[in-house]
Amino acid sequence: MKAKLLVLLCAFTATDADTICIGYHANNSTDTVDTVLEKNVTVTHSVNLLEDSHNGKLCRLKGIAPLQLGNCSIAGWILGNPECESLFSKKSWSYIAETPNSENGTCYPGYFADYEELREQLSSVSSFERFEIFPKESSWPNHTVTKGVTAACSHKGKSSFYRNLLWLTEKNGSYPNLSKSYVNNKEKEVLVLWGVHHPSNIGDQRAIYHTENAYVSVVSSHYNRRFTPEIAKRPKVRGQEGRINYYWTLLEPEDTIIFEANGNLIAPWYAFALSRGFGSGIITSNASMDECDAKCQTPQGAINSSLPFQNVHPVTIGECPKYVRSTKLRMVTGLRNIPSIQSR
């Protein structure tokens, strides 16, 4: 009987009490998030996960400066366009920065074979050793190495040519068959570049090479091609009706590359022993270089952020937040900002 009376008293006390609010405190937050089912849901607390700002500059990455090509393209830099001479002393970099419309590329018109693949290969290179693969003064005693210049590659108002290639021409009225080889003893991949000249008429062919039926052969363990010059009149480009087609290969350590020709060879002068590095890359950007250091570089500018996501640019180099297309990305750390009231 006493137990029943106690229950009744408790029930009476509860119904006579004030209204009880069950839940959490609302606040003045205007944070909104999108959920799977709803958009613009107001919540009490949330944190931003998305970085949307940059400094608009090219910066060093972890203290290492980039290779800024300026008015030179990848082609102009690696072939040795004389207008890119200031870049030849650069041996290491954190990344390569190229402008969208570089003026100095292939100064003598022609086709650059597998150019995009070469860019891809160079994007993983963080340093190289530029060295004479075939020294100019001693490698070609039966050919002229000083007359192969052109107004298309002029430098300081004078006809010139690529600094990494040699245009071999006749000597004393003849162009003897040549055969030259190089063994890669660098213990690294070596990038070798060369060209094949295609004159615009048979008169130029005879005058420069003293042969009408020329060929160029290039052979290594992984490369084997024979080139035949195509003599034809073409529209003038940079004042030239002739063309030079450019080629390259990667030579593995201890491998041998052999060049044979009886004319029309644009011979390698300098080659590059490559060192690949994690985190290197190539970006195309109009941003200017600044005295700054960053962990993440984009074509728009550098990002210094600890946030996990960014929407600045999909192309990044370094330790970067993951790119997303979203304009807003927040993580909810609270609840809906709507009070819930129940009466008992």
From Swiss-Prot:
Glycans are attached at N27, N28, N40, N71, N104, N142, N172, N286, N304. Keywords: Clathrin- and caveolin-independent endocytosis of virus by host, Clathrin-mediated endocytosis of virus by host, Disulfide bond, Fusion of virus membrane with host endosomal membrane, Fusion of virus membrane with host membrane, Glycoprotein, Hemagglutinin, Host cell membrane, Host membrane, Host-virus interaction, Lipoprotein, Membrane, Palmitate, Signal, Transmembrane, Viral attachment to host cell, Viral envelope protein, Viral penetration into host cytoplasm, Virion, Virus endocytosis by host, Virus entry into host cell. Pfam families: Hemagglutinin (PF00509). One of its GO terms (cellular component) is membrane. It is found in: Virion membrane; Host apical cell membrane. GO terms for molecular function: host cell surface receptor binding. Residues 1-17 form the signal peptide. In natural infection, inactive HA is matured into HA1 and HA2 outside the cell by one or more trypsin-like, arginine-specific endoprotease secreted by the bronchial epithelial cells. One identified protease that may be involved in this process is secreted in lungs by club cells. Palmitoylated. One of its GO terms (biological process) is clathrin-dependent endocytosis of virus by host cell. Homotrimer of disulfide-linked HA1-HA2. Major glycoprotein, comprises over 80% of the envelope proteins present in virus particle. This is Hemagglutinin. The lineage of its organism: Viruses, Riboviria, Orthornavirae, Negarnaviricota, Polyploviricotina. The gene is HA.
